[in-house]
Each structure stands twice: as C-alpha cells, then as structure tokens.
Amino acid sequence: MNKTGIKALLAPKDCVLVLIDHQPFQFANLHSHEPTMVVNNVIGLAKTAKVFGVPTILTTVLEERGGLLIKGLQDVFPDQKPINRTFINTWEDSRVADAVKKTGRKKIIIAALWTEICLAMPVIQAFGDGSPRQLERNK
C-alpha cells in the first residue's frame, strides 16, 4: 500500500544519501546555476544528513584527473573516503550499490550536478532494482 499525506514524507531513519561527484572539474561547465550557490546547497544538504544521522555515501569519478571532492563537502565527513569510480553510471559500481544496500535504508536520496548523466542513470537503475528513491538536483 502506498503511503500518502504525512506518512509519505521522508524520515531520516528510512533514508540514505548518495552525493555523486561533487568535484571541482564537474563545476567547470556548470551554467544552469551559480556554482557558489550549488556548493553551499550541497554542503548544507550534507550537514543536514549528518545532523539527522542519515548515512551518506560520497563518490568521485576519475579522481586523479578531476580532483578530490570540493573542500567544504569533504570537511563534513573528514574521515570518510569517497568511492572513486570509473563507470559513468554510479549504480553500476558494485561498491556504491553495496554500500547503499548495507545501510538497510529503503529510501535513497541522490544528489548530483548533471541530471542527464550523474543523476538519471543511477536513479533509473536503482528504480529497476526496486529501490525507492528521492532525486535532488543540486541547485
């Protein structure tokens, strides 16, 4: 049975957050929103997740070329090493999918800079796997 009304709202105890590839080179061609605003928003999202105890998975892609996570974001989780991927689709990296599943949380919140690739592909695949999810396009 589908939940409606207040029961349909996200609850921290049910959620896991996946922050995809918030690296300096990813911001280089970002023109849909002002980059500083996007940085502040994703850091705010990460801090909120941390305060509410929402497990957070960090990813990078081709870290050796694209750089580490943006500093403010890594500062929220100083002891956490991002999963450095080579796949375009985050969900195709079993380390990411397994990390999400390991949390036992049923609602996946995914935040990424590029909707067409970084966000859409893993969401479609996670949906196909039967995982409930919430999209968060950084803006």
Predicted regions mapped to residue ranges:
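Active-site acidic carboxylates
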Residues: M1-F87, P132
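Cofactor-binding loop segments of dinucleotide-utilizing enzymes, especially the Rossmann-like FAD-
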Residues: V61, L113, N138
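Short hydrophobic alpha-helical runs that function as membrane-insertion/retention elements
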Residues: Q134-E136
